């Protein structure tokens, strides 16, 4: 019986648990070519006009979805309190350069950002220091972190699930890291013809917003499939919203109905 997972946040990290003769052997493997390719982009994280421009454009929409639910679920007033998220422990898996970690820290949360690309962690740490933000960044996988048995009030799993080999295994790890009554956020890309046109042909080949090969359509996942994975891991879906690009305003907007390409799910552990 084998169980494996591929972590890829601008790089690939594989962890396989192989069972033979009632013993378990853990094998770790890093795809050097993938890591080198995306490590080359690491210094681009905070360049709003660079390779990560699409993510910078999407970030306000992601933050709106996250903070709306944090405010309601944990009864936090983001309009009055100076540090409304104080007391919350937040884990950002696949944190990259810290685009979500930094705003969460500014709101008062205790933030841990993890990534399997070491250069991403170095870039994120340097930028946080420059911004005078206290953020704990670690070069570690979610599996290795789980072995330390920490628990978090909130887990951010944004634009990462489409890069893992086994989404079911990955979501199960996330569930085990989440406190009871905690919240988990997962944004990814739907699997249909439109998502192929927009997320791959449009974004990577026509507009060249993303490097070619960033996404594999076969790893895209439908909202119904992702919701089932949450359910199977003991998580209850609270809300699903679409991230829709408005070409007239040249910005991203939240949608209650359009999940055809980019979407995000908020779930809780009961």
Q: Where do the protein language model's features map onto the residues?
A:
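N-terminal, positively charged/glycine-rich alpha-helical extensions of SAM-dependent methyltransferases
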Residues: 24-52, 56
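Conserved hydrophobic residues forming the short capping helix/wall of the S-adenosyl-L-methionine
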Residues: 70, 74, 128, 230
């Amino acid at each position: 019986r084998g169980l494996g997972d591929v972590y890829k946040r601008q790089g690939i990290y594989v962890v396989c648990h192989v069972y033979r003769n009632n013993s378990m052997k853990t094998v770790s493997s890093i795809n050097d070519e993938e890591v080198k390719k995306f490590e080359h982009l690491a210094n681009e994280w905070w360049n709003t006009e660079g390779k990560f421009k699409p993510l910078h454009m999407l970030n306000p929409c992601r933050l709106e979805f996250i903070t709306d639910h944090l405010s309601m679920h944990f009864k936090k007033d983001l309009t009055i309190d100076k540090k409304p998220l104080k007391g919350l422990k937040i884990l950002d898996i696949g944190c990259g350069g810290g685009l979500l970690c930094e705003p969460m820290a500014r709101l008062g949360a205790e933030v841990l950002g993890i990534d399997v690309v070491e250069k991403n962690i170095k870039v994120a740490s340097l930028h946080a220091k420059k911004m005078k933000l206290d953020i704990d960044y670690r070069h570690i996988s979610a599996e290795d972190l789980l072995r330390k048995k920490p628990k978090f009030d909130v887990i951010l799993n944004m634009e990462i699930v489409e890069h893992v080999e086994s989404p079911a295994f990955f979501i199960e790890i996330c569930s085990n890291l989440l406190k009871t009554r905690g919240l988990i956020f997962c944004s990814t890309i739907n699997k249909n013809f439109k998502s192929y046109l927009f997320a791959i042909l449009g974004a990577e080949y026509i507009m060249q917003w993303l490097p070619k090969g960033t996404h594999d359509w076969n790893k895209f996942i439908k909202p119904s499939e992702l919701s089932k994975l949450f359910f199977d891991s003991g998580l209850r879906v609270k809300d699903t919203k679409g991230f829709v690009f408005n070409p007239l305003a040249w910005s991203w907007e939240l949608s209650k109905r359009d999940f055809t390409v980019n979407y995000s799910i908020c779930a809780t552990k009961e």
